[in-house]
Amino acid sequence: MNATATQDRPIYWGTGRRKASIARVRLVPGSGKVVVNNRSGEDYFNRIPGYLAVLKSPLETLGLESEYDILVNAHGGGLTGQADAVKLGVARALCELDPDNRQPLKIEGYLTRDPRCKERKKYGLHKARKAPQFSKR
């Protein structure tokens, strides 16, 4: 088990990535609060409830949303990418907590890393696929 104990409270780690975002997640037994980069989850995600619902969804699948605090160090990308990275990190930490959690999380798709990233810009084009205007004559 990859859990670290602090004052008899085990800490479960998980790392999540999405687009350009990386989130290191710690699950600590607690009351269900979310702390992202030393700020409350509501404050960090600009009080947009959709982001908090996304990152708590693996806990809600297992019925553990009020039993663990989520402590996150996230960087890179934007809020959407970071929220999805935290979701993957929480799911991986829940697998560390109990290997039996893996099956329901896998069925819901929480353990699958989303491989879609920004496509690079090609020379001769304005963006990745946007070509200059074509003139027939």
UniProtKB/Swiss-Prot annotation:
GO terms for molecular function: RNA binding; structural constituent of ribosome. GO terms for biological process: translation. GO terms for cellular component: cytosolic small ribosomal subunit. It holds the Pfam family Ribosomal_S9. InterPro entries: Ribosomal_Su5_D2-typ_SF, Ribosomal_uS9, Ribosomal_uS9_bac/plastid, Ribosomal_uS9_CS, Ribsml_uS5_D2-typ_fold_subgr. Keywords: Ribonucleoprotein, Ribosomal protein. NCBIfam families: PRK00132.1. HAMAP family: Ribosomal_uS9_B. PANTHER family: RIBOSOMAL PROTEIN S9, SMALL RIBOSOMAL SUBUNIT PROTEIN US9M. Belongs to the universal ribosomal protein uS9 family. This is Small ribosomal subunit protein uS9.
